[in-house]
Amino acid sequence: MSPGPSGCGKTTTLRLIAGLEELQTGSVSWNDHVLADTHRSEPPEKRQVSLLFQDFALFPHLTVAQNVAFGLTDLSSAERDARVHEVLEQVGMLRYANRYPRYLSGGEQQRIALARARAPRPRIFLLDEPFSNLDTRLRNQLRDLSLHILKKSESSSLIVTHDAEEAMFMGDQVAVMKDGRIVQVGPPEELYFKPVNAFVASLFGEVNEIAGRVLDGHVHTPIGTICAPGFADGAEVDVLVRPEALRVVADEQNNAVASVITSRLLGRASLLHLSVPNGEVGGLHLHSRVSGKMLPSEGSTVGLTLDDQNVFVFAAENS
């Protein structure tokens, strides 16, 4: 799984693996077998790679079954029909086998595109932001379906996305990209709880940023003292606090105190906009996300505690 912002090189990486772009430097290998380098390139059709495009790219003049069968040229007619039946059944689209793509919804077309890409049993399965064109409900349904299909397959899969939550849901290993380079690789929980820099931390959700200075291995902030091991005294740092790390408590004694600016129910969670006194006009503006319904009135005062595993300290960007 490879998340990253637009323009970081995600799609180009997929196209290089698939053989749709020429390498200018380096090489592409699979199990020590070189697919491409600067001197030679294996043709795309020889690589046993399937690429699921963001825009589905179904053939409008072919039926669903004909679209799925398109890449199965090395099979007999009976084998081809059996494989088409199998993959359409996997994605729940068997009853649409004789329809044309124009009569299908976006979610249905995506299922057909998934079936077509899976049909040849590729050794490498590439997916280019496959769910980005779908509404939230359909996106969640198809992500779940795709995850189960990919887990059961014998292919190695690489999915690129700009959605960090999708990367955490779909990926066993996640490689974060920025400006054409991989910044950090690891399982989702490692990237979420142990990001190597502020970019990775902020990629996996909103963060509150607090500037500070290290003293005796700690940073003193308006919301509490944060451990900052490995930094020299006087070092300028940025403290990043996830909204869910700010826990709202009724007891203000021995806790940081915040004034409620506004509160909003987001369904399964509530988002609170808070102001914490910091000696400046307006105070320090922070966001807290709490589970369930918690809607303190505007102007009320609440106490704050911190969940340390969702608080990170990095060298200030301008230092």
Predicted feature residues:
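Conserved ABC transporter NBD signature motif
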Residues: 26-37
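ABC ATPase nucleotide-binding domain helices that frame the ATP-binding cleft
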Residues: 11-14, 112
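Non-catalytic connector elements of ABC transporters
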Residues: 207-209, 216-319
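Helix-to-loop junction immediately C-terminal to a conserved catalytic motif
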Residues: 18
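ABC ATPase nucleotide-binding domain
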Residues: 39, 46-51, 55
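Conserved coupling/switch loops of ABC nucleotide-binding domains, chiefly the family-specific signature
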Residues: 24-27, 179
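ABC ATPase nucleotide-binding domains
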Residues: 48-50, 58-199
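The feature captures the beta-strand-to-loop junction immediately N-terminal to the Walker
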Residues: 3-5
